[in-house]
């Protein structure tokens, strides 16, 4: 599993741990919990230190429709966040988003695109966007979003 991408690790662990009528409660990779499930709803937990990701993060399209919460931890070296939450139509919660260090990020395009259940975001006013050169479609399709700090 060492050479697997993050999404391949999640898919592998989900398939490996299927039990109790296909109801998975969590997925652990390297003893770190990355996915929690409640019936058909996912909570994704990103931790760069454990995943070893250095340039971009991606969520597989076959699980985005069920993600309701994403928790971000220790993601400091990522440079490309484009499309990270794109099409997460049930997503409404982002614990840790305000603490996300995006100092090295150059691309935020379509980050929250079509996240139609987001109503407000945590305070992102302290984000350092000085290196970002692409923010196109950042909030495109977020029709319920009424508050950005």
What is each model feature region?
Residues 1-149:
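Negatively charged
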